[in-house]
Structure formats: C-alpha cells, structure tokens
Amino acid sequence: MMMKISFNTCFQILLGFIVFIASITLLGRIFSRPSKTKDRCRQLPPGRPGWPILGNLPELIMTRPRSKYFHLAMKELKTDIACFNFAGTHTITINSDEIAREAFRERDADLADRPQLSIVESIGDNYKTMGTSSYGEHFMKMKKVITTEIMSVKTLNMLEAARTIEADNLIAYIHSMYQRSETVDVRELSRVYGYAVTMRMLFGRRHVTKENMFSDDGRLGKAEKHHLEVIFNTLNCLPGFSPVDYVDRWLGGWNIDGEEERAKVNVNLVRSYNNPIIDERVEIWREKGGKAAVEDWLDTFITLKDQNGNYLVTPDEIKAQCVEFCIAAIDNPANNMEWTLGEMLKNPEILRKALKELDEVVGKDRLVQESDIRNLNYLKACCRETFRIHPSAHYVPPHVARQDTTLGGYFIPKGSHIHVCRPGLGRNPKIWKDPLAYEPERHLQGDGITKEVTLVETEMRFVSFSTGRRGCVGVKVGTIMMAMMLARFLQGFNWKLHRDFGPLSLEEDDASLLMAKPLLLSVEPRLASNLYPKFRP
C-alpha cells in the first residue's frame, strides 16, 4: 500500500538524514577526493558544492519553481554547462549552442537513453512508447513505426482533409464568438484547435464519447473539455525534477509532494477516454474483419503487420503511444500562437507585414490552405522568433548517457541526465544580438538573401523541435498545425486587446513560461461573410 506524506514531513526526514550524515562529511571528502592527475582527465562540468550523499538535492527541494534553481546556479557559476549531483545522479545542464550540437550530433549515440522516472513510467505505461522507452530494440521498433507509417508523407496527406475540417471549424468558432460579442481567450481557443486536430488525426473524430456532446459552433463538449483538461494536468507534471526520482531507491513507495500520484491519476483519466475507442477499433480490425479503408493513425497502428504476418504493435503499446501523442501534440502550437499574437499586437509593424504577406500570397477571396504554407515565410519567421524567446518548456526532454563520454571538454559519467535549456539557448546574448527583442527578420536572412523558412533549427541556437536520435518525429505535422492556426487567425480577423485585459505587458510566468495573464482579445471579421464556413462535427 502506497504511503502518502506531506512535503513538510518529507523535508523533515531529509533534514534529519542530513544531520545524521553531517558528522562524516570531512571523512567522506578526504576519502572521495580523486588525485589531481585523475581530476584533469575526468573533470566534471562546474557545479555547486553539495552535501555528502544527497549532493545538491536539499537546495533543489527548497527552490520553487525547481527550474529556477538551474537558471540561477548557471548564472552564478557564469558557465554554459554545469553539473549538479542529486543523491548520486549527475544532472548536466547546457546553455550553449555549440555544446548542444555536440550532444545531439557527435555524442548522439552516447546520450540516446531516457531516464527511468516515476512520472514518465506512468505516462509510458512502463516505458512502452517511443518517447519514454530506453534506447534499444523496442525503441527502434516504435520509432520505425511512427516515422515510416504514422508520420509518413502518405499518411499525413491522407489526413489533410481532417486537418482542414478543424481549420474551418476554428474560423467558424471565432466568427460565432464575434456574432455573440464574446471575448476570445486565445490560449483556450488555441488549445481547442490543437486538441480537435489531434483527435481527428488520431481517432478520426473530435469527440471521445458516443453521445457526441458538443455544440454546433465549435465548442468542446463536457467530456472533451475534461479530456483536454487532464491532458494538460498530465503535461504539467513533467517539468518537475521531482525529488522522488532521485531518492526512490531509498524512499520507494513514499508519495513525496504528491507529484507521482497526481501524474498517475491524470494519466488514468486520459486513458479512460482513449481506451474505449481503441478497444472498439481493435475488435473491429482484428476480430470482425476490419473497415473498408485505413482512415486515421489508430487504424494504421492496429493494422500494421511484420514480415511473418503478425501484428506489429500490441493493444497496450497502442494505448500508451496514444497517451503520448495527446500530451505531445497540443501545448507547443497553443503556446506559440498566444505569444506570437501578443507580440504582434505589441509590435503593430510586425502584424502589418504578416497581413501584407498573407494578402499577397493568398488574397482575400479564399481561405489560406496547407499548400500556401511554404510561401508564407514571414509568418513562419514569426513562429520561429516566438520559439526562440517564448519556448513552451524550460528544457528539452532529458537524455541519459549510455556510457562515459565528454561534452565541452568535460567528463560526463555513464547514467548522467542531460538537460538542454530552451531559454538558455534562445535568450543567450552569446548567440543572439539583442536577444530579448522580438525581430522575425533575423530568421529571413541566408547569405544575405531571403530563403525559404522552416521551423526546424538545426544549429541548436534555439529549440523548436528536438533533434537527434530521440528527436521529435512530428516536425512536419507540428509545422502545419502551427502555421495554419496563425494564418487562419490573421487572415480571417482583425484583433485588438479586450478592455478587461489592461495594458499589454507580455509578462511571463516563471514556472510554466506561459503568458502570465491569458491573452483576451476582441475580434472583427476581415473577409467577406460568405467565406466563413459552418461548423462540421
């Protein structure tokens, strides 16, 4: 039976443990000090001094948000790579584009593992997904399935009609809000769009219950709202640097801070919506002869077979991977959309340039389509600049060293956790001139001339989508979702601050990196009334 203890109780236990071992501090340091010769050959990156055994863990526990601990420490150490010791686990943080490139190019194979964390275990259902599994045969299988089948050009082209339905529904929803004189919460609306597109591609429908409980104007039904809520609740458990992950071998079963339990509860709620759909579809395909054609990602997963005619992906693996898709697909486009529109309203000249490009490339006689995206370079430059300054998370998903290696000339022991800091790259004055200024034009210049803009940043000067062996496989669909949402927002409507929002400050929440106050806007149509589509369920 799992024991639950409060944060204060846990902290008292840890402090007691610290007092108990403090008496051996001097002795431990004497006997653990390596020779100077060995130090020069195996020097760790700079770091803060720590307690015996627990290392820097007490400092981490006492700092909230925990991501702030690393930012402050690296600033204090004046370094672009640092090492922290959490109860014997070396945690390496990186703020340098040069070292990040080394990590995901030259040392990619050495750093291709994932940490075994309690929260990640819950999401991956014991590490069954591509994103959570250790580097090995199972990871290779899931990655091959997703890259060659799920995210293939053929499959994404098949799903274009489904994505277009939700792009049209987005316009219909905003237009209905205008007709009712409603305030637009950009964050909420962006998440609804990301959710609806993901559900269409994954399950072939935006609703998760047979009751089909949603309105006829684009709003989510009660079940869908709850599904989306628990997806984000699960996502919010991920950035934690939870102490339980570093001391689980000592305190296994104790629910420190409640984070592990919160993650499990929310993951199970996500599954409670996903699994009935998956079970029903597995039965149709594998027991009742199937459907006339493969129509979505779920159909693709279920019908894949190996060279011997055996089903390639088990139902449990499908269920786990669907949870991972739900968690991975929605927040990045939604966060990018809110910050981009906020920056455009703060900088009207940038908004004017984006609208000018849309009017020249697409015009005002039809709605922008996916085929237009390749020609909307300024719009994509705005998305890139938002990724640079306003990332959706503090760190790239952690990598683990599979063997002893080096980074930046420092020794990295096997088992080290590697964290590349997104704000540390995108806002780094060593990489970017005037890094806090929002300037999309900086992404348009290639050898002095304008080039086609993509959202991928291969040089690791900022992170849009992670790269390397463990990199994001959804770059193409992520780009489509992001660019289409922004293009439809801008082409279809004129936006201005709602009177209740107050002055536009664009302040950032330290913990989540979201805009501190949700962006509330008023909206007016900018196209002919006949171009606004009706909602399609």
Swiss-Prot record:
Which protein is depicted? Hexahomomethionine N-hydroxylase
The source's domain of life comes to Eukaryota
Q: Name one GO cellular component term.
A: endoplasmic reticulum membrane
Q: What is the lineage of its organism?
A: Eukaryota, Viridiplantae, Streptophyta, Embryophyta, Tracheophyta
Q: InterPro entries of this UniProt entry?
A: Cyt_P450, Cyt_P450_CS, Cyt_P450_E_grp-I, Cyt_P450_sf
Extract one GO molecular function annotation from the record. homomethionine N-monooxygenase activity
The chain's coiled-coil residues are none
A Pfam entry, by short name: p450
Question: Which keywords describe this protein according to UniProt?
Answer: Endoplasmic reticulum, Heme, Iron, Membrane, Metal-binding, Monooxygenase, Oxidoreductase, Transmembrane, Transmembrane helix
Q: What induces it?
A: By methyl jasmonate.
* EC number of the protein: 1.14.14.42
Recorded hits in Gene3D superfamilies, A to Z, give: Cytochrome P450
Q: Which reaction does it catalyse?
A: L-hexahomomethionine + 2 reduced [NADPH--hemoprotein reductase] + 2 O2 = (E)-9-(methylsulfanyl)nonanal oxime + 2 oxidized [NADPH--hemoprotein reductase] + CO2 + 3 H2O + 2 H(+); L-pentahomomethionine + 2 reduced [NADPH--hemoprotein reductase] + 2 O2 = (E)-8-(methylsulfanyl)octanal oxime + 2 oxidized [NADPH--hemoprotein reductase] + CO2 + 3 H2O + 2 H(+); an L-polyhomomethionine + 2 reduced [NADPH--hemoprotein reductase] + 2 O2 = an (E)-omega-(methylsulfanyl)-alkanal oxime + 2 oxidized [NADPH--hemoprotein reductase] + CO2 + 3 H2O + 2 H(+)
Q: Where is it chiefly localized? A: endoplasmic reticulum
Subcellular location per the Swiss-Prot or TrEMBL entry: Endoplasmic reticulum membrane
Q: Does the keyword Iron apply?
A: yes
What happens in the null mutant? Plants show a slight lateral root growth reduction.
Q: Which cofactor does it need?
A: heme
Q: What topology in the membrane does the UniProt record assign?
A: Single-pass membrane protein
Q: In which tissues is it expressed?
A: Highly expressed in hypocotyl and roots. Lower expression in siliques, stems and leaves. Barely detectable in flowers. Expressed only in the vascular bundles in apical plant parts.
Question: What does this protein's UniProt record list under function?
Answer: Catalyzes the conversion of the long chain elongated methionines penta- and hexahomomethionine to their corresponding aldoximes 8-methylthiooctanaldoxime and 9-methylthiononanaldoxime.
UniProt cross-references to PANTHER family, sorted A to Z:
CYTOCHROME P450 77A4, CYTOCHROME P450 98A9
Give TM regions: 7-27
Provide the family line. Answer: Belongs to the cytochrome P450 family.
Might you name a Gene Ontology BP term for this protein? glucosinolate biosynthetic process
